[in-house]
Amino acid sequence: MMTNGTGRAGTVRRGAGALAAVLATTLLAGCGPAGTDSGSGGTASTSPSANPKQALLAAVPDGSEGAFRFSGKDATSDLSGVVDPAAKGIDLTAAVKDPEHGFTTRMSFLVVQERIWMKVKFTGTDGLTGLPKLPNRWMELDRSRLTDPDATPTYEGVDVGNAGPIIQAATTVEEKADRTYAGVVDLTAAEAAKAVGEEEVAALGDAARQVPFTAVVGADGNLTSLTLDVPAAGTAKAWTYVVKYADYGSAPKLAAPGGDAAQPAPKLAYQMLNG
């Protein structure tokens, strides 16, 4: 039991389980734009295209660009990591601060093919006792030992930020001369709602049909950022959905950790994930 005098039992377990679910679902829904190629990483144009929407979709990563970095945030979380299409791998990290006790849980997952490893680190723990003591190495997980195997990440494609389905749901797209795009997205479209979060979209009501966005394409023709400015709705404050892609072809390649860098996950790791 973790406590600082007023603590609640199970805080870390609940937090770790929720964080794992966030890492597996937020910005990693594995959606694909309906009825269109999600992109080919083509050469950027210096003048507006005849079809800005299709030009923007063509900039969405499709796996031909090599390994690249990504980061993103939505209403509740921030993620960052690397995607390596050749390895069918992702390396992603998120950090969540406990609002009651003040410590931060930093959780990382590494997926290569069908295998998955996890790391957990706690910071800001002065004065706290009972935090789980886990190895500093990558801990390989057996999905069959998880209560919900789908709550941990899997490799489901390169567009981890779901830029494709969001852009596909755009009702207007305007291309600027500096490779910046602006427009409006109808988030009630099925795949777009899944990408951003169906509960969050439902809370917007009619405003979900008119959500402004901006996007930037790099000189190499690849998407570098997509930002949705989600309006306030009811008691919910306005928030932004941001996806950033960078270092196409130059990010580190992913591989299964070997030797002393990894070990089988201990029982305590499964207790954290299973809640």
Question: Where do the PLM segments sit?
Answer:
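C-terminal motif of bacterial Sec signal peptides marking the signal peptidase cleavage site
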Residues: T26-G30
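Subset-of-secretome marker
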Residues: T3, G32-G275
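Bacterial N-terminal signal peptides that target proteins for export
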Residues: M2-L19
